[in-house]
Swiss-Prot record:
Manner of cofactor binding, per the entry note: Binds 2 heme b groups non-covalently.
Record-linked SUPFAM superfamilies: a domain/subunit of cytochrome bc1 complex (Ubiquinol-cytochrome c reductase) (SSF81648), Transmembrane di-heme cytochromes (SSF81342)
Alphabetized PANTHER family for the sequence: CYTOCHROME B
Listed GO biological process terms: mitochondrial electron transport, ubiquinol to cytochrome c
Organism: Dipodomys deserti (Desert kangaroo rat)
Name listed for the protein in its UniProt record: Cytochrome b
Residue numbers binding heme b b566: 97, 196
UniProt xrefs under CDD domains: cytochrome_b_C, Cytochrome_b_N
UniProt keywords, alphabetically: Electron transport, Heme, Iron, Membrane, Metal-binding, Mitochondrion, Mitochondrion inner membrane, Respiratory chain, Transmembrane, Transmembrane helix, Transport, Ubiquinone
A GO MF term: metal ion binding
Subcellular location: Mitochondrion inner membrane
Gene that encodes the chain: MT-CYB
Amino acid sequence: MTIMRKTHPLMKMVNHAFIDLPTPSNISGWWNFGSLLGLCLVIQIVSGLFLAMHYTPDTLTAFSSVTHICRDVNYGWLIRYMHANGASLFFICLYLHIGRGIYYGSYSYMETWNVGIILLFLVMATAFMGYVLPWGQMSFWGATVITNLLSAIPYIGADLVEWIWGGFSVDKATLNRFFAFHFILPFIIAAMAMVHLLFLHETGSNNPLGIPSDCDKIPFHPYYTTKDFLGLVILLALFFTLVLFFPDLLGDPDNYSPANPLNTPPHIKPEWYFLFAYAILRSIPNKLGGVIALVLSILILALLPHIQTASQRSLMFRPISQFLFWLLVSDVLVLTWIGGQPVEPPFIIIGQIASLTYFTIILALMPIAGIIENKMLKW
């Protein structure tokens, strides 16, 4: 008698992806983040759906509707804080997932890596539009400043900004379309995640050694389902600690004031997970130059497979590259800190040095380190 999961058309797909999937026997906890990102996406879609039932995308009532959710809807405060902090959790997992991909050379799987970069852009766009919806001070001014960056594009910039706004300023039309896009994009992200998995399962997973592991594979279930479940429990414990004890830790107090176009906050800044890119944007005095640097700070990930010079894939046995990797991590943390500081000395020069260091490490130092390590290993 054949097992149903191996014959039923739908079950067979699930079986090949999550049960009988041949997996390297030595992958570590760093490979947990893919499934954790899936969990984050489910949390965001479910909590967002319930919020959308009570939210009104109108400039006059948006702020009040969020207040109504927190005060009058059963467990509305919990759903709202789960959604707000779920975004932070999503980005923590996302950045750790990307960091693992860089450290262990997973970018060698070009299709999977490129789909991952598209996913990153989609998640960032979704998060930005979601931040605008509560219609607080930082929502309004963040939307105004970030959308205004498009005016730096030569010739079509000004028209493009007005087209996105749906008028001559951020107003009801902008809020309405941002809500529509914010609602649909997570489902597009879910579809793209399936494509991401499809490409990954074409090649099989990488492993910490960065060597082929076809001769030593084990089934995904029960070994990695239990391992992923442990990661899931830890993640949920951290998540609910944040939601129930420190719900406003990662938010901005300015967003508790209703949007007022006549009163500019002293320091306009995006959510913490965009601060590193925001710091790079601000470190260049020229508007167009800043926008190009902002886009390149993410798009530079697509260059990694093309500027790889080392013969070894993983950084596990490459001490010089390891040092540069952790220097890059430290640099991103410095940029995140600078992005949250006012534009005044000494933060300006620190931001400029950190931005230059970011691009130098990725574009110059890491490829040079790869060549030196090849020479040292006589490869």
